[in-house]
Regions:
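Membrane-proximal intracellular helices of multi-pass ion channels
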Residues: 1-218
Length: 218
């Protein structure tokens, strides 16, 4: 019982400390926390393929690259990570592309709770807009457009990838590719560091990818 009270007290202190921070500092701390959490998850046995040794430095680099959507890799995504590991990278790319504040507010909206003024200020800071009025509606629109484009992109990509992979594998590749393309992440999970070179003559996939990259960059 005492241990539980100590944990609750520690969590209360952390939340009280965060409340005193500026929106920009909270966003920076949020990115740092997501990157560190991502690195730890990528080092877990369920994330790394058998026989692959992933150092903390390489896991941290991969997580940072995914969250900051730079596209730089030090290990091949498909050859090094399991389906769960690739799912972690996909989530990191999505969070990095949308932004910590937008994801946080989106979760609050999904939970049916009221979005606080501080949360609105964080979104204002992250999206670089002049007013925090209409922030909830803006986040809803951003999330809807993002998920809409990614869903359509994944569906079209599946039409291409299902010819070369099993249905389940093709679904995984399609979702990963669509999210990575829309967020301009530069990651691929086709293996062998080939990226989309094997599909350089596939007009449908190339046009779809181009549209995702352009739409995500707007």
């Amino acid at each position: 019982m005492c241990e539980k009270l100590r944990k609750e007290e520690a969590m209360k202190r952390i939340f009280d400390l965060l409340k005193k921070q500026s929106p920009s500092r909270i966003i920076a701390l949020g990115f740092g926390a997501v990157i560190l959490t991502g690195a730890i998850l990528l080092m877990m046995p369920f994330s790394v393929k058998k026989g692959v040794h992933l150092s903390f430095l390489n896991a941290l680099f991969t997580s940072t690259s995914a969250v900051c959507v730079t596209g730089l890799v030090v290990v091949d995504t498909a050859d090094s990570f399991t389906a769960i590991g690739q799912m972690v990278i996909t989530m990191l790319i999505q969070i990095g592309g949308l932004g910590i504040a937008s994801v946080g507010v989106g979760l609050i909206i999904a939970a049916g709770k009221r979005v606080s003024i501080k949360s609105r200020l964080m979104v204002k800071e992250a999206l670089n807009v002049d007013t925090y009025g209409g922030m909830v509606r803006l986040v809803r629109v951003v999330l809807a457009i993002t998920l809409g484009f990614e869903a359509v992109g994944a569906l079209i990509s599946f039409i291409v990838f299902r010819k070369d992979y099993s249905p389940l594998h093709a679904i995984g590749i399609s979702i990963f590719h669509s999210i990575a393309a829309f967020n301009n992440a530069g990651f691929d999970n086709l293996g062998g560091m080939h990226n989309l070179i094997p599909y350089k003559d596939n007009i449908l996939l190339n046009i779809t990818t181009d549209i995702l990259v352009i739409a995500g960059g707007l």
